[in-house]
Amino acid sequence: MATGAENQWLKGRVKAVTSGDCLVITALSHNRAGPPPEKTITFSSLMAPKMARRGGIDEPFAWESKEFLRKLCIGKEVAFKVDYKVEAIAGREFGSVFLGNENLAKLVVKTGWAKVREPGQQNQDKVSPYIKELLQLEELAKQEGYGRWSKVPGAAEASIRNLPPSAIGDSAGFDAMGLLAANKGKPMEGIVEQVRDGSTIRVYLLPEFQFVQVFVAGVQAPSMGRRTTNGSVVETVPDEPNGDVSAESRGPLTTAQRLAASAASSVEVSSDPFATEAKYFTEHRVLSRDVRIVLEGVDKFNNLIGSVHYSDGETVKDLGLELVENGLAKFVEWSANMMEEEAKKKLKAAELQCKKDKVKMWANYVPPATNSKAIHDQNFTGKVVEVVSGDCLIVADDAVPFGSPAAERRVCLSSIRSPKMGNPRREEKPAPYAREAREFLRQRLIGKQVIVQMEYSRKVTQGDGPTTSGAADRFMDFGSVFLPSAAKADSDEVTAPPAAAIAGSQPVGVNIAELVLVRGFGNVVRHRDFEERSNHYDALLAAEARALAGKKGIHSAKESPAMHITDLTVSAAKKAKDFLPSLQRIRRIPAVVEYVLSGHRFKLYIPKITCSIAFSFSGVRCPGRGEPYSEEAISVMRRRIMQRDVEIEVETVDRTGTFLGSMWESRTNVATVLLEAGLAKMQTSFGADRIAEAHLLEQAERSAKNQKLKIWENYVEGEEVSNGNTNTVETRQKETLKVVVTEVLGGGRFYVQSAGDQKIASIQNQLASLSIKDAPIIGSFNPKRGDIVLAQFSLDNSWNRAMIVTAPRAAVQSPDEKFEVFYIDYGNQETVPYSAIRPIDPSVSAAPGLAQLCRLAYIKVPSLEDDFGPEAGEYLHTVTLGSGKEFKAVIEERDTSGGKVKGQGTGTEFVVTLIAVDDEISVNAAMLQEGIARMEKRQKWGHKGKQAALDALEKFQEEARKSRIGIWQYGDIESDDEDTGPARKPAGGRR
């Protein structure tokens, strides 16, 4: 110790009491990192009874002496000074310590817990400055029989503790399992004798004085390393004007320090970062203090694992939780598993928060990469349309108009995983209990109103499903779904949310994920620390635990019921015909709608015969895929009957194996729903006498026509249309549209838009409201073939909806890379650079394209590469697109051989008679008259309407032939039975 430190009063706090005359005092403040410096002070001129060393016994009254001093001053602020130092005993420092105005040495002597050591002749300077008062107080204590001077017979012997063998060092005689069995879950009183590191303490268990080492359950503090036996003790040098302890000193080893030194290795290993700070944190709170220990378990090395609780004023605190919350220990799963679930969750949550806040030992923590991302403020209400599996639903958003395909949102239930349904195309069978899980939700949710809280999205990895290289990333959206109108049986099965949750963010109702788990139809996903998870994760864990305890569903030892289903949709048509008699015998057959294949065609499951069939309405047809209103018809049917219980009557089966008949849902003929909405029409070729409730279907169709709904929006009642002049009557009823031509191709083909269609104005308004941003960053947006985007038309720089027709095979590397795009609302097609395309909002891209491909009926027009092809194309362009007129298009037939729309000239083609509103003859007849087209070849099996139309057109062709104009200038031309393919015209057209 520096000489200047003697005889100077310092301030500190009592950290530990090692005996009845010795304290460890730490500085109140310090200027360096880490724990404050400390001093070990023995009271000058006093000698308290000595505590037992290992294998020894106490001196009489040693424990009472130490306890008196411990209870008097532990954790309290004191003032002290060093009176003298004895080099012969490792430089031990002796001094005077005051608690407030009380001299602690005087209090100890006065109560008889220490005797006064008188100085020898050679040590006259090694004496307390209060020696006279101490001697007087000692004499009084002797006279009164206080403390060690007790005059009670046998008091000295009774004060000696009967110490059991120590459980530290040589633990051969210590029965850790027996101690645990006797005290499991019970709080045990103890006094902490030593802190080995932040999460390991050595304790006297009361009242037996069993000396044990306890590892704090669920946590692990940084290691203190291994130390040599020549340990150093801190020395104090005054460097503050107020006299606080602020430097280091050497002092004698305490009993606890000797215990640590005895187990130390001769090889020194440095401590981990924050180890010293964690140790001091624990010392400051529990060393030499009363604690309560709850034993949780014993590890394979016979070490005790327990929770340690201490008092902080009126509050009882958990040492392990405090260490973790302050970033001085980490959560340890293996020992936390011994604890109660609630305590374990608190530790885990505290560590996660410290990692997020980068506290202490987590300052440089970098969370592992995660493929999940939180979703904020995307809650909605809607109706369940489809149960995909036990953990995935499709919900129609109430905020989106009824019937819109954009209304449907796929929601995966957060933080749970149900058995997979498999994939019939890849010959993957459903996992055990997969069908049961889906059916369980189907019966409870289909058609029900639910509340959805979106919580996070996750990037789909290869483990989640097949991916193709270069394909755009796919994301799955997860959320919690609540059923407000749950049945009482279901409500009773799940844990009711606390009142605070109901008043806060949790909707009133049953959490569907919780219901799935309680029935044993799923497991809770064990997320990594920083992965997003359900906001109701704890409730899900509790539900899973209940299913495990009850051995329900996938947790039971029973195998799931085997089910063999005959799928006639993938079988030969002959097999379907074999089933026809058995289905016709039953008047109304209960069935479940498995899929909506189109507006009028479905896949049904018939439980009675465990069979799946393809089913279509008799005499009712919806627009085909790619045609206007086809998607809306599908959407309406999904909302109305998807996965619902229905009844069917089978009338016949077609050549493809599809059964034809009628369907009822809740006693309503489903076909009437489509007809009333203007999304289907009756087929006159199918005898009305063969259709059940045909009169209802006719009434529904008539109602839609009168209101001009959907496909009937341009319908004109009783209108007669001629290919030649207005006096020739077409008796067969045909659909008539009012249109404007937007693009002319060649070979008599062109694109039209419906005139006055409100959808056109709606989409134009949506596009006008968009804020077109700068070109996307290279690599952030990689559109592929078939994607709908925004593209800038080269002629007027307007932004329009477009479909990618061709795209670079590799990821985009330059803003000049070329994409061929098809403008789905106009029919134009051109090549544009990457810089001229943008991503499009799904709400704008969802509506079908407004441009409809058409071809002039009953005539053959030369292609652009043929003779008179350019003249024909120019004429058609002039009289249609160039005139700006409005036309009536009479649909003679629909050609679906073009398949889906993939670009210009593809998709369903309307074969039409086109006539301007103010003209007497059709464009078809006019082109024959100009000699730039010829009639189709007559066919013997053509229907009467077609023959009549050809008869009316023939006079116009004869007029051109006789005048030898156009293609007839050299006389008759050879008949060509084949239509020539149209060539594409450079982009242009109407805007």
Curated annotation (Swiss-Prot):
InterPro entries the UniProt entry points to: Silence_cplx_Nase-comp_TudorSN, SNase_OB-fold_sf, Staphylococal_nuclease_OB-fold, Tudor, Tudor_AtTudor1-like
Phenotypic consequence of gene deletion: Normal vegetative growth, flowering time and flower morphology. Reduced expression of enzyme involved in GA biosynthesis leading to reduced levels of GA-4 (e.g. GA20OX3). Slower growth in salt conditions. The double mutant tsn1 tsn2 exhibits severe alteration in germination, growth, and survival under high salinity stress. Reduced levels of stress-regulated mRNAs encoding secreted proteins. Abnormal stress granules (SGs) and processing bodies (PBs) assembly accompanied by reduced uncapped RNAs levels in heat-stressed double mutant tsn1 tsn2.
Broad enzyme group: hydrolase
Residue positions where Phosphoserine is found in the record: S975
Enzyme Commission no: 3.1.-.-
Tudor domain residues: 782-847
Domain TNase-like residue range list: 8-151, 186-364, 378-557, 587-714
Tissue-specific expression: Expressed in seeds, leaves, flowers, roots and siliques (at protein level). Accumulates in the cap and elongation zone of the root apices (at protein level).
UniProt-listed SMART domains: SNc, TUDOR
Activity regulation: Repressed by the specific inhibitor 3',5'-deoxythymidine bisphosphate (pdTp); this RNase activity inhibition impairs subcellular relocation upon abiotic stress and leads to reduced stress resistance.
Modified residues (N-acetylalanine): A2
Protein name: Ribonuclease TUDOR 1
Encoding gene, per UniProt annotation: TSN1
